[in-house]
Curated annotation (Swiss-Prot):
The keyword Cell inner membrane applies. Its main location: membrane. This is p-hydroxybenzoic acid efflux pump subunit AaeA. It comes from Enterobacter sp. (strain 638). The keyword Transmembrane applies. GO terms for molecular function: transmembrane transporter activity. Forms an efflux pump with AaeB. It is a single-pass membrane protein. Keywords: Cell inner membrane, Cell membrane, Membrane, Transmembrane, Transmembrane helix, Transport. It is found in: Cell inner membrane. InterPro entries: CusB-like_dom_1, CusB_D23, MFP_Efflux_Pump, PHBA_efflux_pump_AaeA, RND_pump_MFP. The chain crosses the membrane at residues 12-32. Belongs to the membrane fusion protein (MFP) (TC 8.A.1) family.
Length: 310
């Protein structure tokens, strides 16, 4: 009898443990596969690629790599003497054509006043046409001067906003061409998070929902709000051939990989460049309200920690 009771007890305990394990595995499966979260998230920021609008020798570099700069602070300067000479030349042309215009206007006015009684109509028309030609040349000279002035102003490269200088790869004495990127500026107060959510989890993601962000290698949890969800992603399995026909890649019907959709998350409190743009994080969407960790069960607390560091 004791042996039977012992066997029944062992069987009951085994069945109970199996049931508990099944429940735990089921809850873990739902928790990890259906709840809206991802480890594929990146800190991002607005980045300006700074390139000069003029070409020439770099005569001064006023900043260092990774320096925090203010808006309109001078970053570097390009060959000002050359552009100063070009401006002086264009100003001389303007002064010449202004004087010539005054002379031709006076001459045309005198001939028009005398009229055909003193000279032929052809001479009067010729004088008026010459005045119009000189006025046209003056306008061109003024436009050239304005462009020279603009070029001179743009020899001084300034920061378009507050931010951090990064990847500075220009040095005094180098020749830089127009439009070539010299440095990147990471705008201050522009940091956000891009979470690449699987399409199967988008049902639980809406603009305005709250989010928890855990940077990789950190136990600090940041808070944020879903700002927007991308309206589309590239279809990598469908392209066009040289004749414009659709080319669709073959796939296995029983294996379908979920597409990842970018979700932009606005941070409640920006941490400057503590987590640089491009670094990774885990993102959990908690719904309309923040998660109250004190109300979580032990299982959920453990699952959250494993998910954050997984």
């Amino acid at each position: 009898m004791k042996t039977l009771t012992r066997n029944i007890s062992r069987t009951a305990i085994t069945v109970a443990l199996v049931i508990l394990a099944f429940i735990a595995i089921s809850r873990a499966w739902v928790f990890y596969t259906e709840s809206p979260w991802t480890r594929d998230a990146r800190f991002s920021a607005d980045i300006v690629a700074i390139a000069p609008d003029v070409a020439g020798l770099i005569t001064a570099v006023n900043v260092r790599d990774n320096q925090l700069v203010k808006k309109d602070q001078v970053l570097f300067t390009i060959d000002q003497p050359r552009y100063q000479k070009a401006l002086e030349e264009s100003e001389a042309d303007v002064a010449y054509y202004q004087a010539l215009t005054t002379e031709k206007r006076r001459e045309a006015g005198r001939r028009n006043k005398l009229g055909i009684q003193a000279m032929s109509r052809e001479e009067i028309d010729q004088s008026n046409n010459l005045l119009q030609t000189v006025l046209h040349q003056l306008a061109k000279a003024e436009a050239t001067r304005d462009l020279a002035k603009l070029d001179l102003e743009r020899t001084v490269i300034r920061a378009p906003s507050d931010g951090w200088v990064t990847n500075l790869n220009v040095y005094t004495g180098e020749f830089i061409t127009r439009g070539s990127t010299a440095v990147a500026l990471v705008k201050q107060h522009s940091f956000y998070v891009l979470a690449y959510m699987e399409e199967t989890k988008l049902e639980g993601v809406r603009p305005g929902y709250r989010a928890e962000i855990t940077p990789l290698g950190s136990n600090r949890v940041l808070k944020g709000t879903v700002d927007s969800i991308a309206a589309g992603v590239t279809n990598s399995s469908a392209t066009r051939d040289s004749k414009g026909m659709a080319t669709v890649d073959s796939n296995l019907e029983w294996v379908r990989l979920a597409q990842r959709v970018p979700v932009r998350i606005r941070l409640d409190d920006e941490q400057g460049n503590l987590w640089p743009a491009g670094t990774t994080a885990t993102v959990v969407i908690t719904g309309e309200k923040d998660r109250n960790a004190s109300n979580d069960s032990l299982f959920r607390k453990i699952a959250h920690r494993l998910r954050e560091f997984g």
